[in-house]
Design a protein with these regions (language model features):
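N-terminal non-cleavable signal-anchor helices
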Residues: 2-3, 29
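Short linear motifs in low-complexity or flexible loops
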Residues: 3-5, 14, 18, 24
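N-terminal membrane-targeting hydrophobic helices
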Residues: 25-197
Length: 197
């Protein structure tokens, strides 16, 4: 099983950050955070972009994939993963299928399916359903590749993840403000996309 132990001084810093965030909405350094943005947000944005090019699935795929990095550059909230690590330098090669690991996979799977379902519900028509699905899927894909990279940190995956970490916001929003900001952002993108119909 992947060790989640942290040096004592890092655990202390994370406790201090958590105590500060319980008192008020805040931003904390992502240096000690290895979670991910809600996949549903990425899927909704990818679906919204795909709805603008309903007859061009290849363009939807490229734009959806690129949108992931643009959104990750914005400070946002992450949900915690108990066993899977996705931070810089993460290594999941010794990950075992414990209850914590299965819970993490279940949460991520529900998140991804919910995002795909919402994207299809909000944007898909009879003639664009596959394009919307492609846009939503590719918008979530970089986080899946990030996990694959923790298992096989080589080649193009390594170069992609270096870029992913570089562009990713180093500040994290917390609490209700963090959750609300993502809901508001996804809603705003959806409204903007539908205004072009």
């Amino acid at each position: 099983m992947l060790s989640r132990a942290k040096p004592q001084h890092l655990r202390g810093q994370r406790r201090d950050q958590a105590n500060q965030c319980h008192r008020s909405p805040c931003q904390v350094s992502r240096k000690y955070i290895d979670n991910q943005m809600i996949l549903s947000t990425h899927a909704i944005v990818g679906g919204a972009i795909a709805s603008l090019v309903p007859s061009h699935p290849a363009a939807a795929a490229i734009a959806g994939f690129a949108s992931h990095f643009a959104i990750d550059a914005i400070p946002h909230w992450d949900y915690p993963l108990r066993s899977i690590s996705l931070g810089k330098g993460a290594n999941n090669r010794r990950l075992s299928f414990s209850s914590a690991t299965l819970t993490d996979f279940a949460i991520v799977g529900i998140d991804a399916c919910a995002g795909l379902g919402l994207a299809l519900w909000m944007f898909a028509t009879e003639g664009s359903i596959w394009t919307i699905a492609v846009g939503a899927f590719t918008a979530m894909l970089p986080d899946a590749l990030q996990f694959v990279h923790t298992l096989y940190p080589r080649g193009l995956l390594h170069a992609l993840q270096r870029f992913h970490w570089w562009i990713h916001s180093k500040r994290a929003l917390t609490g209700l403000f963090g959750v609300g900001s993502q809901l508001a952002f996804a809603g705003m993108i959806a409204v903007l996309a539908r205004s072009f119909y």
